[in-house]
A protein has these predicted regions:
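Transmembrane beta-strands of outer-membrane beta-barrel pores
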Residues: 27-33, 80-84, 139-145, 193-199, ...
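Short glycine/proline- and aromatic-enriched beta-strand/turn motifs that initiate or cap beta-hairpins
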Residues: 19-66, 70, 228-234
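Extracellular loop and loop/strand-boundary signature of outer-membrane beta-barrel proteins
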Residues: 43-50, 104-110, 157-164, 207-213
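Membrane-embedded beta-strand positions of outer-membrane beta-barrel proteins
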Residues: 23-27, 76-78, 121, 135-137, ...
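Outer-envelope beta-barrel architecture signal
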Residues: 19-23, 70-74, 129-135, 168, ...
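Outer-membrane beta-barrel translocator domains and adjoining extracellular loop/strand segments
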Residues: 35-44, 86-93, 147-156, 200-208
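Residues that define the transmembrane beta-barrel architecture of outer-membrane proteins
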Residues: 21, 53-57, 113-117, 131, ...
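Predominantly the C-terminal beta-signal and adjacent terminal strand-loop region
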Residues: 36-38, 164-234
Length: 234
């Protein structure tokens, strides 16, 4: 095992430019961040109407590691991320519905919220000017910390449903942005979208079937501010 670890560290030292590693903080604009989980079905197989979960603040830290190959950068993050979805439908089995049930029943409103620690690892391709653009793509592991369910119509309190969801989810991520490289400091602004590659659960949760669903999130503006380690004034 020690030999494998030593070999891995040696390979990294051959491909990473240590002098330009930057670490910093990253946060999104909650007004232009949204997530959704769909499609969702009830126990009869009827599809719920789903709506995006907007206006959520996410933040965390990042490390940006230029590779010795020109234009390529390894970008890693550790973020708090909130995802969820709103849904509505008639949660009454078909056998219990009368011919005019839509006139006598209220449409039930629900909300699922999932909180993750998100750890993306992205490969970036960038220009070389002080103010430059970049593209990025990669994968992420999301670690579930808490999941809650709310039946909004009856003003019920949030219910902890964490045990019903998978603790670990793999996602794909793509995006792009611009970077301002100012001596010791770099500032980034980007947009990014991600989607689940593995299921968030494999069974019904409070009468909602997630078996065919896919989680999706979109952040139109996120800002990062980083500090270069080992920077030497030229």
């Amino acid at each position: 095992m020690k030999k494998y670890i030593t070999l891995l560290l040696l390979l990294l030292s051959c491909t990473v430019s240590m002098a330009q590693i930057a670490v910093g903080i990253r946060l999104n604009n909650p007004l232009v961040y949204g997530s959704s989980i769909s499609p969702l079905y009830n126990e009869d197989g009827k599809k719920f109407n789903t709506y995006g979960n907007w206006g959520v603040f996410n933040s965390g830290v990042f490390a940006r590691i230029p590779l010795k190959e020109k234009h390529w950068v390894l970008h890693t993050e550790l973020l708090y991320k909130n995802e969820g979805t709103h849904l509505s439908g008639f949660d009454v089995p078909d056998k219990d519905r009368g011919p005019y049930y839509r006139e006598s029943l209220y449409e039930e409103k629900r909300h699922f919220s999932l909180q993750y620690i998100d750890a993306p690892c992205l490969l970036q391709w960038e220009g070389k000017r002080m103010f430059r653009g970049y593209l990025e793509a990669g994968f992420s592991l999301k670690f579930l910390t808490h999941a809650s369910y709310t039946n909004g119509w009856f003003n019920a309190p949030d219910e902890n449903v964490t045990p019903h969801f998978n603790r670990l989810v793999l996602t794909g991520q793509v995006g792009g942005g611009v970077l301002w490289d100012i001596k010791r400091v770099m500032i980034t602004a980007d947009m990014r979208m991600s989607w689940n590659l593995t299921p968030i659960t494999g069974h019904l949760v409070r009468g909602v079937d997630f078996s065919e669903s896919m989680g999706f999130s979109l952040s139109l503006i996120s800002i990062g501010v980083g500090y270069k380690l080992g920077y030497k004034k030229k």
